[in-house]
Every structure is written in C-alpha cells, then in structure tokens.
C-alpha cells in the first residue's frame, strides 16, 4: 500500500466520527414548528442567547414558543438539558400570568415532542379567541 492510500484510508475511517462530533450539541439549538397549530419553538439551550423579536426587554433567553403572524409568545425562562434527547423547560406567557413546566424530547433528527407538565395549559391566540394546545405536541425541524 502506498503512503497516499494509507492516508486516504485513515481519513475515510475518521470522517464519520468527525461528522458525528460536529452534530453533538445541536439537538437543542433549532427552529422547530408545528403546521397544525401554526406555532414554533426557536431555541438555543446551550448558549441561551435567543431574543424575542419586538420584546427585547426580556433579554437573552433559552428560547420561546411563538405563533405565526402574531407577537404573542411563551418565554422559556429556564431549561436543563438532561441528555442529547431530552430537556426540561420552565415557560411563562408574555403577560406573566401563567406558567408551566414541560419536557422537550428529540425523537429523531427532525421530529421533536413537547409534553406539557405541571402548571397552566399553553394557550395561543387564534382568530380572536384563545386556543388551547394539546398536552403533547409534535414539532418538525426546519
């Protein structure tokens, strides 16, 4: 075997490990959405540097749940990444009148599931009324 073939073989063997290492830590740095309810999560649980557009008063946060074409949001006030697939969240609505705990789980590379826990039920504006979101809601990565 020539030295060039040895180097090429070594690189090909290491390449999958390098790609996998780059994806580590990206599970909870994403924009994920639910088309059924027109809601989305913009999150970065690692750097916690997300700002809510038009509501910069909150400062940098782990993320928020927003509604398309609406400024209403549920702010993620704190989070704890348990592992690469699970994070626990504390959320509060932008009025400060309701709060809850929730769990966000990454099912695979593109599917996330938000499960509401103790506290209030997430409600979002929809055609002039409040719409309760289901206790378990699936999001897709964009």
Residue spans of the language-model regions?
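Central antiparallel beta-sheet cores of small beta-barrel/beta-sandwich binding domains
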Residues: 23-101, 116, 121-142
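Residue-level recognition of beta-strand termini and adjacent short loop/turns
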Residues: 83, 106-108
């Amino acid at each position: 075997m020539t030295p060039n073939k040895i180097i090429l073989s070594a690189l090909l063997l290491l390449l999958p490990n390098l790609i996998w290492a780059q994806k580590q830590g990206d599970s909870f740095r994403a924009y994920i959405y639910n088309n059924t309810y027109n809601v989305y999560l913009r999150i970065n649980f690692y750097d916690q540097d997300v700002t809510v557009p038009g509501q910069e008063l909150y400062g940098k946060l782990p993320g928020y749940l927003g509604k398309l074409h609406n400024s209403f949001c549920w702010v993620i006030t704190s989070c704890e990444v348990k592992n690469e697939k699970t994070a626990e969240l504390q959320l509060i609505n932008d009025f400060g009148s309701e709060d809850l705990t929730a769990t966000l789980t990454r099912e695979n590379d593109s599917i996330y599931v938000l499960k509401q826990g103790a506290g209030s039920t997430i409600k979002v504006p929809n055609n002039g009324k409040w719409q309760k979101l289901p206790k378990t809601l699936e999001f897709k990565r964009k």
